[in-house]
Amino acid sequence: MIQRHKLIVLIFLLIFCLSGCNTSKRLPYSHKYSYKELSKDDPHNLTYKGHYKVGKNYKIKGKTYKPHSTKSFTETGYASWYGGRKDGFHGKKTANGDRFNRNLLTAAHKTLPLPCLVKVTNKANNKSVILMVNDRGPFKKNRIIDVSQKAAEILAFKNQGITKVKIEYLPNETEKFLKNINLKKPQSKTLAKNSKKSSSTKVTKNAKCSVNCHIKLVNLKYKLAVNP
């Protein structure tokens, strides 16, 4: 009787393990959601509207900023968000010719290449999200990054307006992302310095996955919630 009971327990454990294995195979990060679901905030944004640029040095309010390419970059400071109904940024062109959309996973930074991917972590609650930097700013004292309204919601600081964050530049993910949206960096140093447009046709490799969809796929790879 005891041996029969043990056998039943072992059978249940085996079924549970097999079920867990099948679930993990059925739902890898890139197929947990359909491309249609991941593209719902920008379904027609299948070609990247901006261009790759580093940019020249520039001055704002008497302070000089020096955009630069980098292989490693971390920064800690305060983040704010933009794209509210009254600030007028929604739909406007960004610093690299993209269109700002408050519902997408994007951000503005003073010196990082455009576009690039960064991981932003809210120090107050440890929530993180990976964003595409496609604009310049913020230029208020003690602010190191401006995130979109959607990103502020994910990081849970929309209501308070600002929060302390850590920024981590993701060089490898950036390179893969640029390939996925078919955006090439300028080949010559002169072109990179002058920030001229890439000669790429800028069409996403998968016509069913929007630009924001590609950003969400990187988040899912890192097991970060993107609320598709």
Swiss-Prot record:
InterPro entries given in the database record: RlpA (IPR034718), RlpA-like_DPBB (IPR009009), RlpA-like_sf (IPR036908), RplA (IPR012997)
Enzyme Commission designation: 4.2.2.-
GO MF entries: lytic endotransglycosylase activity
Catalytic class of the enzyme: lyase
Keyword line: Cell wall biogenesis/degradation, Lyase, Signal
UniProt entry tagged with the keyword GTP-binding: no
GO biological process assignments: cell wall organization; peptidoglycan metabolic process
Family: Belongs to the RlpA family.
Classification via PANTHER family: ENDOLYTIC PEPTIDOGLYCAN TRANSGLYCOSYLASE RLPA (PTHR34183:SF1)
Function: Lytic transglycosylase with a strong preference for naked glycan strands that lack stem peptides.
Protein name in UniProt: Endolytic peptidoglycan transglycosylase RlpA
Organism in which the protein naturally occurs: Rickettsia felis (strain ATCC VR-1525 / URRWXCal2) (Rickettsia azadi)
